[in-house]
Amino acid sequence: ETNLIYYQIKKELEEKKKEDQTVNISEYSIDNSSDFDTEEFVRDIFVNGNTLPDVLVCMDEVVTECVYQALIDYNQVGNVDVVGFYYSDVILDAISKGIISSAIALDMEEIGRYSINALEEYSSLGHTSSYYSVGQNVITRKNVGTYRTGANQ
């Protein structure tokens, strides 16, 4: 799934760029079997890289939170535009503060509906569709409040 998202982003950027514009896209596969491995990989981007990326697109919650912390730790807030994934309290706070520009969130209500539909289909037919396409939402500073739970508003 991550590769599909990566290739969609790459295709869109290549189609939308101006003729005289150069866009270099790099994909990094992070071993996220432990939070420490993820933190080390993100640290290497900020410490060992010759140049920081202009935009960093995170494909999961752990990487998004690690990048957020690295931006602060290495004094790079405002130097890298970050598109995160999911909406934990940490990520929502980062968006509210303008440290992360936006995050992609799956429509959890739709996931729930599709799950129930799949269970009902499996119960009655003995099988179900192997793929359900779920909607995505973009969380920005303008709409971050709608993603906060009652206690965290």
List the predicted regions and their residue ranges:
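Extracytoplasmic "Venus flytrap"
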Residues: 1-4, 61
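Hydrophobic alpha-helical segments within soluble ligand-binding/sensing domains
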Residues: 3-11, 36-39, 87-91, 106-124
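Hydrophobic alpha-helical
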Residues: 8-9, 24-26, 30-92
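Short helix-loop-beta junction
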Residues: 11-20
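Paired acidic/hydrophobic, glycine-rich loop segments that form the ligand-binding mouth/hinge
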Residues: 56-57, 102-104
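Glycine-rich loop/hinge motif
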Residues: 95
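Glycine-enriched alpha-helix->loop->beta-strand junction motifs that scaffold or abut catalytic
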Residues: 98-100
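Hinge/cleft segment of the Venus flytrap/periplasmic-binding protein
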Residues: 107-153
